[in-house]
């Protein structure tokens, strides 16, 4: 369909639907926010508090061990987010990684074996941390979300906001399913 990514495709559909009903929207790209460094401070904060971040995440997700680092560097060789973070340098805002692969949805995604260094702008936070990070970066004070997020995603986001970022989460609004 001519879009560069899955996200770009669905963003275009949303923008088109909003335009059809006369709702003005401002579309922001997380990729661009990371690339411009707008997430640098929150990435540094999560990585600085990674022991606390691990403890909070373990309340919601199995398999969080003492080696878990809440950042996914994009491999410079294969461009995948299949890396294990080996070290963090908060001063230079970089991580050292190895592209080892990961398991997702019961499937193994192979890594290419490359080892390298990435800046905080060359990766992303895992989604459970990224959502509350967006609240901080974008100054979100009201957050609507589908009912499917009310029992898992939202409670973990609240917990991370309060106990990792030390902010109050936005006012929530749960909605039913809707179609555009």
Regions found by a protein language model. Give the residues of each.
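N-terminal Rossmann-like or analogous alpha/beta NTP/dinucleotide-binding catalytic cores
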Residues: 1-54, 64, 156-159
